[in-house]
Swiss-Prot record:
Protein name according to UniProt: Large ribosomal subunit protein bL21
InterPro entries xrefs: bL21-like, bL21-like_sf, Ribosomal_bL21, Ribosomal_bL21_CS
UniProt KW keywords: Ribonucleoprotein, Ribosomal protein, RNA-binding, rRNA-binding
Subunit organization: Part of the 50S ribosomal subunit. Contacts protein L20.
Highest classification ranks of the organism: Bacteria, Bacillati, Actinomycetota, Actinomycetes, Micrococcales
NCBIfam families the record matches: L21 (TIGR00061)
Function: This protein binds to 23S rRNA in the presence of protein L20.
GO biological process, one term: translation
Family: Belongs to the bacterial ribosomal protein bL21 family.
Record-level GO cellular component terms: cytoplasm; ribonucleoprotein complex; ribosome
GO molecular function: rRNA binding; structural constituent of ribosome
Length: 102
């Protein structure tokens, strides 16, 4: 089984060909392809982690859609002063399909 650890959207993800991964928003529209930098490559028993070898490895992904994550609510409260603050946030996300590890 071939898989790679890639840096994507500020995080590290374990991916293999055919996987669907949700990342922080990546520039580009639906249908475009992106390349993700590999940090580690595992091909059966062979593990590649040297930077010179990983520079030759490309992990390609196709952007499927841009979406937004679930809403989270942030609340602040100070006792005895009447201070209350409420704020919501929805993270911008991108769903991609890993198309190749070469």
């Amino acid at each position: 089984m071939v898989y790679a650890i890639v840096r994507a959207g500020g995080r590290q993800e374990k991916v293999s060909v055919g996987d669907f991964v949700t990342l922080n928003r990546v520039p580009g529209g639906a249908g475009s392809t992106i390349e993700l930098p590999a940090l580690l490559l595992v091909d059966g028993d062979k593990v590649t982690s040297a930077a010179a070898d990983l520079a030759k490895v490309t992990v390609t992904a196709e952007i499927l859609q841009d979406l937004r994550g679930p809403k989270i609510v942030i609340q602040k409260f100070k006792n005895k002063t009447g201070y209350k603050k409420r704020q919501g946030h929805r993270q911008e996300l991108t769903k991609v399909k890993i198309t190749g590890i070469k």
